[in-house]
Regions:
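Intrinsic low-complexity, intrinsically disordered or marginally ordered coil/linker segments
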Residues: 1-255
Length: 255
């Protein structure tokens, strides 16, 4: 399983800019429709759809390629075939069939998109291997907050596309949208930061100290308060569990 990164996205708007659309909920639905499902879940495929060619109906059990290296081996066979102009040696009918299905599709995908398989494509274009997971959405009068998890990293490619969409709203007369993304890895104190979009301007902060990383972790993953951490007289955060080696009997934290 991956390390999960918790992402908290808050989208705010100025009511006067959008009041011609309707009430607060109607405005939120207007803003969010291009990247949320009808169930109000953040959907990466609405912003950057996975090409149909990555959904080919392959069955690894019917080929000689191990599933863990399926597309890579088939791609290599087909690449050798294209490069040499002849069939690789010692290839039986079953492997030959796989080469011209999985291998050819992987080769064509790489030539077109720079990624042979869905995993590489998602990492390249989304910035993470899976769509948003464990999503929750909270709506208020002038903003919406969506919290969701991603594998290994915050989805940088998705944020870039989202900001382009907000730029387009700005250009057609809908200013006043602000979007803030705070993220924190489940690995305490690491891989944390904040991205802010405001009226076409983007700022990115990657927390540079362990203490800042813990502060972000507490904010994003614990709702701003967690007994597992404490702040010293200089304002730096510390992790009880780390300092006491996981010995709960000695640790003063009430968690």
């Amino acid at each position: 399983m991956p390390n999960w990164v918790r992402n908290r996205m808050t989208v705010k708007f100025e009511y006067d800019t959008f009041k011609v659309i309707g009430n607060g909920m109607q405005i939120l639905n207007f803003i969010m429709k291009p990247f949320c499902t009808e169930e109000c879940v953040f959907d990466f495929e609405k912003l950057i759809p996975i090409p149909d060619s990555y959904y080919a109906d392959y069955d690894p059990s019917k080929t000689l390629y191990p599933s863990s290296a399926l597309s890579e081996r088939a791609l290599q066979d087909y690449s050798d075939y294209v490069g040499m102009g002849k069939m690789p040696e010692n290839m039986d009918a079953e492997r030959h069939k796989a080469m011209f299905t999985i291998g050819k599709q992987s080769y064509d995908n790489y030539q077109r998109y720079g990624a042979a398989n869905w995993y590489d494509w998602c990492c390249k274009y989304w910035g993470t291997k899976w769509d948003a997971c464990h999503a929750e959405r909270t709506e208020r009068e002038d903003c919406v907050e969506i919290i969701f998890d991603t594998a290994w990293s915050t989805p940088t490619g998705i944020w870039e596309r989202l900001f382009k969409y907000l730029d387009n709203l700005l250009k057609v007369g809908y200013p006043g949208i602000n979007c803030t993304i705070a993220y924190a890895d489940e690995d305490v104190g690491s891989n944390t930061g904040e991205i802010i979009y405001s009226a076409g301007n983007i700022s990115f902060t990657e927390d540079s100290t362990y203490s800042d990383g813990i502060a972000r972790y507490i904010d994003v993953r614990c709702g701003g308060d967690c007994p597992s951490f404490y702040k010293d007289d200089e304002g730096n955060y510390h992790y009880y569990c780390e300092e006491y080696g996981g010995d709960c009997d000695k640790c003063p934290a009430n968690c």
